């Protein structure tokens, strides 16, 4: 089965600002900026979608009951019926649901055995629109990985690997993480331990951060500094308690791919790498 990790979603208190941040720093693009459809989405606190040419990001306006932050990711498969068949056969406790037709990416929604939600679709699905139907393009700055912290990383990695034929990348023997790749984008499955949060605020299992590959980490640092001066609204979120902030950043920095860590205006942790 050919599988592409081509989507993730953010729930945001200010989704227009959050999308603008990724446009400004990583040159991500909207499909129809300024269109009536987009303006209606903004007026109704719905969502906007941006893309690096391969991975689409839907930034959703926060509604009552929604938890802000990285919300879910999505995969595109070449045979969605076969993917659903595998999941239902091997993991009967996992639910797969048809999604409403107004979702720009998700044709189906499902979850892994620990309850982490993900979207499932295939090329040509009738619901797909916006950045998710545009031709692929290359650009110097692109989404490189997502990190998912779980209680049982071996079992969850097996679920995604065997259900969707993602390739497991090589790693050091002492590395507790699993690296599942479609050849371009990587899903990192990492252990969640409460002890990792000693001395800092505790966060639940789930998506931890997003990583971008860039042409020059130093250039990104300079552009972030300039952005703070030019448009303070787009400055990153900080943790007021210094020691707790250092502890949380250290967790993000443990990613083998990351060279520099920061956060978006909404507090989404981001790391960047050149290789």
Model-predicted segments: where are they?
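Core segments of cupin and vicinal oxygen chelate
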Residues: 1-2, 9-56, 147-194
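Helix N-cap motif at beta-to-alpha junctions
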Residues: 14-15, 78-81, 152-153, 214-218
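Short acidic/glycine-enriched loop/turn segments that link adjacent beta-strands
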Residues: 37-44, 67, 102-106, 173-176, ...
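Polar/charged low-complexity regions in secreted precursors and cytosolic/nuclear IDRs
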Residues: 52-53, 69-74, 79, 114, ...
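Short amphipathic alpha-helices within nucleic acid-binding modules
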Residues: 80-87, 218-224
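Vicinal oxygen chelate
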Residues: 85-139, 179, 225-275
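Structured core of small recognition/catalytic domains
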Residues: 154-157, 161-234, 250-251, 265
């Amino acid at each position: 089965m050919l599988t592409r990790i081509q989507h993730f979603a953010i729930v945001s208190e200010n989704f227009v600002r959050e999308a603008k941040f990724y446009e400004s720093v990583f040159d991500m693009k909207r499909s129809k900026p300024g269109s009536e459809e987009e303006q209606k989405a903004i007026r109704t606190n719905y969502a906007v979608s941006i893309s690096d040419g391969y991975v689409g990001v839907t930034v959703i306006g926060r509604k009552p009951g929604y938890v802000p932050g990285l919300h879910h990711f999505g995969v595109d498969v070449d045979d969605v019926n076969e993917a659903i068949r595998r999941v239902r056969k091997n993991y009967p406790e996992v639910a797969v649901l048809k999604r409403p037709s107004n979702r720009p990416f998700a044709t189906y929604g499902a979850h892994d055995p620990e309850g982490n939600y993900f979207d499932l679709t295939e090329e040509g699905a009738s619901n797909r629109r916006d950045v998710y139907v545009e031709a692929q393009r290359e650009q110097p700055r692109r989404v490189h990985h997502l990190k998912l912290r779980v209680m049982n990383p071996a079992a969850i990695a097996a679920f995604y690997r065997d259900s969707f034929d993602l390739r497991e990348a090589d790693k050091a023997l002492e590395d507790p993480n699993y690296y599942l790749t479609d050849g371009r984008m990587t899903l990192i499955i990492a252990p969640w331990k409460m002890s990792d949060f000693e001395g800092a605020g505790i966060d639940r299992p789930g998506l931890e951060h997003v990583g971008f590959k860039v042409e020059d980490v130093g250039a990104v640092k300079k552009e972030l500094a300039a952005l703070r001066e030019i448009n303070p609204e787009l400055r990153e979120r900080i943790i007021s308690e210094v020691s707790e902030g250092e502890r949380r950043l250290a967790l993000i920095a443990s990613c083998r791919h990351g060279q520099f860590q920061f956060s978006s205006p909404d507090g989404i942790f981001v790391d960047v790498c050149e290789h």
